[in-house]
């Protein structure tokens, strides 16, 4: 044990102190600048410095886990327990009850019809994880910046989406994503992960006997509403802003967003490009969801009335159902599918693009917005998409792909790469611009 502690101390001296000195220096400099009024106290630290600080902290934690591997195993086990605790209090709507202000555990247990003792133990554990705040003097729990992200929308209106608690008015909230991940149907799919690995089909299909998309279309339309709404909350990563700033949409008059959900990216494109119209191609149920949810936003409703954005029912596997356009977009669509289906989808789009070229004499472009895994499995950037890749495997039967894997399905579909642009901010997607061969 003494040897382990000595190694830990040595690693702290080697790895921790330089990082700690750097972080402290930045904070002292920031404080002095505030004192001298060179910058406002409300200004945040520059993003680069913030990212570096987080990397320093992460690297120190990672180094300790390498020295004492038991720490890693305990952390992984604890993470699962924390998720279960958080899932329960989320289901009990504890966050919603705390929106009006701090409450004692007795008040919370009465509101949630729960065991006061057991609820307190769970809340205490989540407080230690900095998900809630606890005031020792008056023994009340309250929301913090983390738990506020998991509150529901304002009181229900006539909209069925608000009545179901899945229409969030705050782009920063993550309630819909958490609802989806903690939904019993999803949990059952994770319990079938062993069957997924053994059989090669998704855990969802192993458990429910059909694919995820078949299930939400045929058996459980409520989870489809959650799924569609959860896609909105990718706004929390500001990915749509990255895309708008990272690609010139203004040179395209007609854009078709294939599998564009309820129009999140489409509305952003229209808002920033006055001469561009967008067609969102989706399945019938999603089109209904998109039109319904757009009704609560006056700006979106006006855009639809002006026909600058239209929803169209179609099937991306069938070329004739894909409308003509100058630019086709597929944002995080291909990763939902295995290679055979991905090639079928891309071939279908390529066929439509070829018909458009024969008709107009101009070749449309296809913009794929998706993750690209690093070919080197030991590269730190590989970690960014490994967990999403497991989600694809277990739930929808799709996968995240390396550049060489992307190259294979693109070539097999009769397409070729023009440009690739990688974003260096979460969720670390890439823009792959394609044309027909």
Swiss-Prot record:
UniProt binding sites for S-adenosyl-L-methionine: 259, 282, 315-316
PROSITE patterns per the UniProt record, alphabetical: SAM_OMT_II
Gene Ontology MF term list: 3,5-dichloro-THPH methyl transferase activity; O-methyltransferase activity; protein dimerization activity; S-adenosylmethionine-dependent methyltransferase activity
Keywords per UniProt: Methyltransferase, S-adenosyl-L-methionine, Transferase
Recorded catalytic activity of this chain's protein: (3,5-dichloro-2,4,6-trihydroxyphenyl)hexan-1-one + S-adenosyl-L-methionine = 1-(3,5-dichloro-2,6-dihydroxy-4-methoxyphenyl)hexan-1-one + S-adenosyl-L-homocysteine + H(+)
Signal peptide: none
InterPro entries the UniProt entry points to: COMT-like (IPR016461), O_MeTrfase_dom (IPR001077), Plant_O-MeTrfase_dimerisation (IPR012967), SAM-dependent_MTases_sf (IPR029063), WH-like_DNA-bd_sf (IPR036388), WH_DNA-bd_sf (IPR036390)
Any one biological process term the GO annotation gives: biosynthetic process
PANTHER family: O-METHYLTRANSFERASE CICE, PUTATIVE (AFU_ORTHOLOGUE AFUA_4G14580)-RELATED
Family the UniProt entry places it in: Belongs to the class I-like SAM-binding methyltransferase superfamily. Cation-independent O-methyltransferase family. COMT subfamily.
Identification of the protein by name: O-methyltransferase 10
Lineage of producing organism: Eukaryota, Amoebozoa, Evosea, Eumycetozoa, Dictyostelia
């Amino acid at each position: 044990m003494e040897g382990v502690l000595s190694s830990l101390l040595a690693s702290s001296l080697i790895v921790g102190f330089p990082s700690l000195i750097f972080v402290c220096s930045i904070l002292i400099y920031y404080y002095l600048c505030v004192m001298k009024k060179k910058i406002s106290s409300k200004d945040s630290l520059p993003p680069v410095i913030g990212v570096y600080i987080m990397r320093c902290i992460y690297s120190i934690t990672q180094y300790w886990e390498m020295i004492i591997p038991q720490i890693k195993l305990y952390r992984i086990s604890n993470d699962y327990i924390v998720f279960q605790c958080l899932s329960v209090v989320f289901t009990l709507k504890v966050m919603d009850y705390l929106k009006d202000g701090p409450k004692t555990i007795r008040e919370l247990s009465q509101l949630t019809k729960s065991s006061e003792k057991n609820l307190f133990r769970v809340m205490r554990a989540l407080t230690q994880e900095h998900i809630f705040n606890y005031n020792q003097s008056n023994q009340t729990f309250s929301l913090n910046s983390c738990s506020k992200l998991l509150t529901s929308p304002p009181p229900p209106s006539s909209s069925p989406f608000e009545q179901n608690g899945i229409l969030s008015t705050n782009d920063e909230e993550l309630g819909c994503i958490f609802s989806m991940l903690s939904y019993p149907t999803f949990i059952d799919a994770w319990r079938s992960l062993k069957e997924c690995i053994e059989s090669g089909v998704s855990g969802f299909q192993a458990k429910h006997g059909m694919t995820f998309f078949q299930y939400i279309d045929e058996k459980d339309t409520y989870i489809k509403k959650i799924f569609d709404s959860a896609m909105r909350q990718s706004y929390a990563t500001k990915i749509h802003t990255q895309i708008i700033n990272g690609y010139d949409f203004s040179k395209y008059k007609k854009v078709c967003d294939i599998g564009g959900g309820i129009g999140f990216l489409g509305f952003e494109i229209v808002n920033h490009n006055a001469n561009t119209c967008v067609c969102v191609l989706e399945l019938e149920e999603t089109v209904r969801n998109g039109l319904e949810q757009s009704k609560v936003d006056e700006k979106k409703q006006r855009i639809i009335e002006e026909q600058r954005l239209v929803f169209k029912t179609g099937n991306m596997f069938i070329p004739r159902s894909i409308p003509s356009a100058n630019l086709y977009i597929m944002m995080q669509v291909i990763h939902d599918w295995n290679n055979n289906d991905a090639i079928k989808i891309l071939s279908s789009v390529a066929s439509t693009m070829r018909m458009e070229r024969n008709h107009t004499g101009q070749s449309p472009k296809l913009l794929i917005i998706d993750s690209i895994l690093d070919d080197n499995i030991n590269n730190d950037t590989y970690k960014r998409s490994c967990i999403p890749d497991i989600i694809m495997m277990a739930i929808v039967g799709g996968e995240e792909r390396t550049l060489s894997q992307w190259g294979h399905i693109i070539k097999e579909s009769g397409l070729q790469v023009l440009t690739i642009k990688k974003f260096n901010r979460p969720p670390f997607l890439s823009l792959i611009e394609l044309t027909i061969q």
